[in-house]
C-alpha cells in the first residue's frame, strides 16, 4: 500500500544533536518540511557516506525550510558514541533520532523484523505531517542528498 499522504503518527523519541540529548516529538515536525532518513545501524559502512552527504547539503535543506532527521534503531547513547568516534559522523549537526522501540520504523513501514533494524528509507513530510515523497532502497544501495533535495524542491 502507498505511503503517500499517510499522516505521521504521534511519536516521542530521544535524539542526539550538537553534543546534547533531546526529545523530538511529532509537534516538532508540524509547520515545516521534514526529511526522515532511516538507515540500518550506526558503525556500518554505507551509512556514514550517506549521512555525511546529507550534512554537506544541510544548509540548503534548512534554507528551504526543511529539517533533516536521521533515524536508526540504535539508542541516542550509541549515536553519541558514533558521533564522537567517526570523523564523518562527527560533522553532523542535524538531529539523530533513536528508535530502539521500533515505533518510528513501524510507522514508516521500514522495520526489518528479523534483524530489528531499519531499511534504507527516505521520506519527505509536508508541514501538515503527511508523507509526500518516499523511497526505500534494498541492502547496500546508497542514496544521494542532491536527488533528495531536488525532490523536496518539487514537493
Language-model features: locations:
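Chalcogenol-based redox active-site neighborhoods
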Residues: 1-155
Amino acid at each position: 500500500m502507498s505511503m503517500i499522504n499517510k499522516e505521521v503518527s504521534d511519536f516521542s523519541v530521544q535524539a542526539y544533536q550538537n553534543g546534547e540529548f533531546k526529545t523530538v516529538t511529532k509537534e516538532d515536525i508540524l509547520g515545516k518540511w521534514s526529511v526522515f532518513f532511516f538507515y540500518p545501524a550506526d558503525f556500518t559502512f554505507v551509512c556514514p557516506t550517506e549521512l555525511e552527504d546529507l550534512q554537506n547539503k544541510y544548509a540548503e535543506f534548512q534554507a528551504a525550510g526543511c529539517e533533516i532527521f536521521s533515524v536508526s534503531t540504535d539508542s541516542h547513547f550509541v549515536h553519541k558514541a558514533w558521533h564522537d568516534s567517526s570523523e564523518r559522523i562527527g560533522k553532523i549537526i542535524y538531529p539523530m533520532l533513536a528508535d530502539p522501540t521500533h515505533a518510528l520504523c513501524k510507522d514508516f513501514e521500514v522495520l526489518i523484523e528479523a534483524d530489528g533494524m531499519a531499511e534504507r528509507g527516505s521520506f519527505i513530510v509536508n508541514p501538515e505531517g503527511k508523507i509526500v515523497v518516499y523511497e526505500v532502497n534494498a541492502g547496500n544501495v546508497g542514496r544521494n542528498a542532491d536527488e533528495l533535495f531536488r525532490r523536496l524542491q518539487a514537493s
